[in-house]
């Protein structure tokens, strides 16, 4: 990434929308975003969504959905993850999780550690406010 050119805390908010999974080193991208922004908003397609899991389980192939619209051979995605994966990553790296919401169709819901399992299963997208 070319984020090195920005000084520390250059921005109040930095937004990365549904592209974290397309980087070769998403952990480094997150670190740089946290360096240049006071807060970071990251959204990810949730590979733990029940329809994605069902497609793999019953059909034995990578799913194609609205949030994952490409087939396996033409996808830009390199590092698919779930809401739970990113939540756990942030905790393991001592990254402050300010708020997490799950998005599904026309509903949004707050995700906390206490409901993480269910929200990971039933949310198409995860949106994290970290910093």
Description of each model-found segment:
Residues 1-2, 11-18, 101:
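Generic detector of solvent-exposed, compositionally biased contiguous segments
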Residues 2, 21, 49:
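Active-site micro-motifs of SAM-dependent methyltransferase domains
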Residues 2-8, 24:
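Short conserved loop adjoining the S-adenosyl-L-methionine
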Residues 7-9, 121-122:
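Flexible, charged surface loops at secondary-structure boundaries
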Residues 9-10, 36:
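Alpha-helix C-terminal capping/helix-to-coil transition sites in glycosyltransferase folds
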Residues 12-25, 44:
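A short SAM/SAH-binding and catalytic strip from SAM-dependent methyltransferases
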Residues 28-32, 39-131:
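S-adenosyl-L-methionine-dependent methyltransferase catalytic module, highlighting the catalytic core
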């Amino acid at each position: 990434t070319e984020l090195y050119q920005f000084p520390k805390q250059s921005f109040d908010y930095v937004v990365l929308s549904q592209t974290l999974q397309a980087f070769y080193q998403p952990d480094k991208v997150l670190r740089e975003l946290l360096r240049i922004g006071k807060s970071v908003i990251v959204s990810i397609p949730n590979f733990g969504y029940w329809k994605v899991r069902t497609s793999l389980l019953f059909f034995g192939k990578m799913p194609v959905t609205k949030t994952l619209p490409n087939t396996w051979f033409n996808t830009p995605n390199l590092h698919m993850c779930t809401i739970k994966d990113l939540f756990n990553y942030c905790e393991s790296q001592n990254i402050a999780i300010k708020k997490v919401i799950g998005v599904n169709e026309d509903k949004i819901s707050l995700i906390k550690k206490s409901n993480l399992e269910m929200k990971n299963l039933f949310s198409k997208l995860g949106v994290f406010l970290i910093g």
